[in-house]
Amino acid sequence: MGFDFKLKISNASQLVVISKGKPFLIGKEMSNIEIIENGTMIIDENGIIFDIGTFKEMEEKYKDKSFEKVLDCTGKSVLPGFVDGHTHPVFSGDRVHEFAMKLAGATYLDVHKAGGGIQFTISHTKNSTEDELYQLLIPRLNRMLKNGTTLIEAKSGYGLETETEMKMLKVLDRASKQFQGVEIVSTYLGGHAIPKGMNASEATDDIINKQIPELKRLKDAGEISPANIDVFLEKGFFEYEDTKRILQAGKDIGLECNFHGDELSYMKSGELAGELGCRAISHLEKVSEDGMKAMAATPTFAVLLPTTAYILRLECPPARRMIELGVPVALGSDFNPNAHCLSMPFVMNLACVLMKMNMNESLVAATLNAAASINKSSTHGSLEVGKFADFVILSADKWEHIIYEMVDPPISHVFKKGNLVFSNNN
């Protein structure tokens, strides 16, 4: 006997919709999220949300329908799956040995000059095979999943030359096809640092004349599927004009611009984003008032990474001012060997404590707005009819426990496209 529907999530104390019909939220909208008390959600055979409403109205409306599975969520909260707007998950070799240096006061640039930092990771990643990198990636994705993350932006960037950069993008493409729990939107980051033996101009030429043409060839052949191009815009790395050239070359082959900016120095990132029509900028600790206004006008998403400010003891980006000016604010973990965080609940907590965002704003930034920052909010980031049924169930009657309980939130189940992909009973 066939069933009318795949799944019914029944009588959740709080069913956190986020927003109805908006691709992202800005300003005061971020504090006004949509919640259905005692809510029920109906999911079809394709893993799409078919209907959502109060328990009472859904029971009456679907009393004659059959369900393959009914999950009683009395006393529980249901939220959208979290979207991590900025990760570097493909790498070999940890950097635990650098943590003591940082605690003793070494800056990011000090570690870099001592032969650590990104160059350490690059050498290890270059020497790893595609299969070795894939085997390292999957446990990381599983740890993200158990923390409620169902969609990530994921970068290359630990090659700085054609072969390794393409190898990393192939690993991400393979995981995207074979790992069902966490969906991946990949980003090409050939301009993450200056390779040894080159200056910035030479590195820029290599990216534009060698790496991007090979990326286009592999993309056209279906071997990789990058959606974005990223550059580390920073003094001593890729500065304004080089960054602009690289981003434009990516735009010319259909990639969205989603770059690192204004982290350690003010580099006119917001202004550049306005000039090129960029989708998103990450970090922004040093962004200017004019830069924020340019981002609000475009609009360009601010993907804020409180883990980085926390671990490097940097000043935090001006999240409150961004929200006041109408910049769309998203969150990311910045998971990488320097900031080893796989938990969006912890990121949301840090956003509240360090960046003075309220809990509603943090949740919007880690769901709908993060999805929009990677052009996925038409299908992800909120619990709306027609979107994928990616959601997290909490063993708590108030959704705020996901932030309040910080590093060990009471996540009982995670669903991806209507399929159970994590249960704490397992």
UniProtKB/Swiss-Prot annotation:
Keyword annotations: Histidine metabolism, Hydrolase, Iron, Metal-binding, Zinc
Binding site for 4-imidazolone-5-propanoate: Y158, H192, E263
GO MF annotation: an example: metal ion binding
Co-factor: note: Binds 1 zinc or iron ion per subunit.
Residues annotated for N-formimidoyl-L-glutamate binding in this entry: Y158, N336
Pathway participation: Amino-acid degradation; L-histidine degradation into L-glutamate; N-formimidoyl-L-glutamate from L-histidine: step 3/3
Residue sites binding Fe(3+) per the record: H260, D334
Biological process (GO), any one: L-histidine catabolic process to glutamate and formamide
GO CC field: cytoplasm
This enzyme's EC code(s): 3.5.2.7
Main EC class the enzyme belongs to: hydrolase
Cofactor list: Zn(2+); Fe(3+)
Reactions it catalyzes: 4-imidazolone-5-propanoate + H2O = N-formimidoyl-L-glutamate
Domain of life: Eukaryota
A Pfam family the protein falls into: Amidohydro_1
Binding site for Zn(2+): H260, D334
Cystine bridges: none
SUPFAM superfamilies: Composite domain of metallo-dependent hydrolases, Metallo-dependent hydrolases
The UniProt record lists the keyword Plastid: no
PANTHER family the record matches: IMIDAZOLONEPROPIONASE, IMIDAZOLONEPROPIONASE-RELATED
The family this protein is said to belong to: Belongs to the metallo-dependent hydrolases superfamily. HutI family.
Name of the featured protein: Probable imidazolonepropionase
Organism of origin: Dictyostelium discoideum
Lineage: Eukaryota, Amoebozoa, Evosea, Eumycetozoa, Dictyostelia
